[in-house]
Each structure stands twice: as C-alpha cells, then as structure tokens.
C-alpha cells in the first residue's frame, strides 16, 4: 500500500528528507521504468555520436550531411531532456491517483508522458522568449556590475541560477501538470513562491549541492578510468578508443540524468504542498457525500 503523503506542506528539512524517503520506497520500480523508457533514446544518441567520432574524416567535408546529423542529434537530445523531466512528473501523477499502488508500469508512464509532451514543448518555446532571454540579459548586467570581482559575480550568478531552477520547475509543473494557461500559471507560481520562500529555496540549494557532488563523481570516475586504462594498457585502435570513450561518457551521463530526478521530485513535493488545503477539502467533500 502507498503510505507516502504527497499533499502536505513541508518545511526545509522535510522537503529534503521526504525526497529520499520516496526514493527509498520506490527506487527499484522508478529507476527500472526510467531506464526502460529513456534508455533506448539515450543509447541511440550515444551510438550516433560515437559513429560521428569514428567516421568523422569520411564526411568532415560533407557539410549538408554533417548539419543533418547534428540536427538529428539536437532533436533527439531535446526529446530526451523532455522525457527525463516529464518522467518523474508522470510517475508521481499516477501514484497520486492510485493511493493503494506500490508500482507503476512503463506502458502507463509512456501514455502520460506522451500527453504531457505537447505542453512541455510549448512551455519551452514560450519560456525561451519570455523568461530565458531576460534571464541571460540579467546575467550580463550582473557581469557588468561586478566587473572584475569574479568571486562576487560567481556567487550572484549561482544564487540567480538556484532561484531560476526553483521558479522554472514550479512554473512548468503548474503549466504542464495543472493545465493552466501560460500567464495565469506565471501569476500563480509567483504567488505560491511568496509562501515559505526560503524553505523552498534552501531545499533547492541543498539538493543542487547533493546532485552536483554525485554528478561530479559520475564524471570524474570515468575520467580516472580512462586515463588509467590509457596509461596501463593503451589503445591503438580508433574504434576501440571510441568505444571506450563512448562507454565512459555513457556512464557519466547516466549518473547525471539519474540524480537529476531527486531535484525534480523535490520540486514536485513543493508543488503538491500548495495543494494540501484543496486536497483536504476534496476528501472532506467525499466524506460528506458518503455520510449522506
């Protein structure tokens, strides 16, 4: 039986701890489905990239073919990012609707994700012009203000980045998951973030540090393995070297994508916490109907 409470306002500590509680409970089912749904697309991108590296000399002067390959990689990568972001949202949504379930099937997840994709794509396109361009302008302004004060610039940029992670993920959840129009969703998110803002921002900051640490390990360990293998045995074959690089990059990227789920789920907990009163009212209403 699913005894995890989704609709609950959480403070800083509970947001962090309950994120790990959720993954301790559902990790096996969650990540098996995650790899099943996203793995094929991820491997396809890796294989195309590996072949590009191996046979680069063959088509390096063929610009139309080169541009086509880059375009295909770009489209596949965009869809991979969308699937990665939508997956935990879809998984949680299915558990919300079926409180007694302890596992979800990949087919169900794919159906929900497929329905989310059009709004997710539209959200990305609109936000690029409405949110991201002004954000990049803000970063340039900060760079001009702080000038050569590199440390202050890095602190200000990092703080702005954490705020942006919190804001954009909450914005996407309201727009994609709740189905509000763009600007009503924007107003709702701004209003919601005013409540317990520092709890939400602090939890986002700490989770980002945790993810960065695991991601760094996922990148550094393959690099150490690469240099160790090259130093001890060496690989003369271009194909062998390419396969080695591909395998190590695949390992590192897989770690990065997997740990990103912790941040996304934390944002889902923040989002669902705003619905606690609404959900409680629904339960009370059902209870009244039963009594009648």
Model-flagged regions — what are they?
Residues 30, 66-70, 74, 119-120, ...:
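Residue-level signature of transmembrane alpha-helical entry/exit and packing/kink sites
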Residues 3-4, 8-9, 13-43, 103-133, ...:
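Interfacial aromatic "cap" segments that immediately flank transmembrane helices
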Residues 37-38, 44-53, 77, 81-88:
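Transmembrane-helix bundle segments that line or gate the permeation/cavity pathway
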């Amino acid at each position: 039986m699913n005894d995890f409470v989704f609709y609950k306002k959480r403070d800083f500590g509970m947001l962090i701890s309950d994120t790990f509680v959720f993954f301790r409970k559902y990790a096996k089912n969650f990540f098996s489905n995650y790899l099943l749904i996203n793995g094929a697309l991820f491997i396809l991108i890796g294989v195309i990239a590996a072949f590009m590296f191996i046979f680069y000399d063959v088509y390096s002067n063929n610009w139309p073919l080169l541009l086509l390959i880059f375009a295909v990689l770009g489209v596949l990568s965009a869809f991979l990012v969308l699937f990665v972001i939508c997956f935990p949202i879809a998984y949680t949504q299915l558990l919300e609707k079926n409180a007694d379930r302890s596992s979800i099937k990949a087919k169900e997840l794919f159906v929900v994700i497929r329905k989310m994709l059009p709004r997710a794509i539209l959200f990305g396109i609109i936000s690029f012009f409405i949110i991201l361009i002004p954000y990049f302008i803000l970063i340039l302004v900060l760079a001009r203000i702080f000038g050569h004060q590199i440390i202050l610039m890095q602190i200000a940029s990092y703080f702005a980045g954490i705020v942006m992670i919190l804001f954009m993920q909450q914005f996407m959840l309201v727009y994609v998951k709740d189905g509000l129009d763009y600007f009503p969703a924007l107003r709702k998110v701004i209003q919601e973030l005013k409540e317990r803002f520092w709890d939400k921002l602090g939890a986002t900051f700490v989770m980002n540090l945790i993810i960065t640490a695991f991601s760094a390990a996922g990148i550094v360990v393959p690099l150490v393995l690469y240099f160790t293998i090259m130093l001890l045995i060496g690989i003369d074959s271009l194909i062998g070297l390419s396969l080695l690089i591909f395998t190590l990059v695949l390992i590192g990227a897989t770690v990065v994508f997997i740990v990103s789920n912790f941040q996304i789920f934390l944002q889902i907990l923040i989002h669902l916490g705003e619905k606690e009163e609404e959900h409680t009212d629904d339960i009370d209403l059902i209870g009244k109907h039963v009594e009648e």
